[in-house]
């Protein structure tokens, strides 16, 4: 997995081992962000629920979003590691919550 566009383009994203997390495929994220680009993502606030790897939030920040919140019960440390690797951790808030209740 990697970041598709923006300032962190090409940076690898780590995923947790096992089947608990199914990261959004690169091509799916690319399609979503191509649509969002037409609506303007620059300066936006992003909420990434069930964030897993943090790839969606990190992709948004890489493409100019002002701030992102990543919510995931198990993978907060991994999300932070990925965000630091992509140099967007200063604009990312991680909330370790279980939302399935």
Each model region followed by its residue ranges:
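Class I S-adenosyl-L-methionine-dependent methyltransferase catalytic core
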Residues: 1-101
């Amino acid at each position: 997995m990697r970041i598709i566009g923006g300032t962190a383009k090409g940076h690898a994203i780590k995923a947790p081992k096992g089947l608990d997390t199914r990261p959004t495929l690169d091509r799916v994220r690319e399609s979503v962000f191509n649509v969002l680009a037409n609506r303007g993502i620059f300066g936006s606030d992003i909420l990434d629920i069930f964030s897993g790897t943090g790839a969606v939030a990190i992709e948004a920040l890489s493409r100019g979003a002002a701030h992102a919140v990543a919510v995931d019960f198990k993978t907060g440390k991994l999300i932070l590691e990925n965000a630091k690797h992509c140099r967007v951790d200063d604009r990312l808030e991680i909330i370790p919550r279980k939302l399935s209740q």
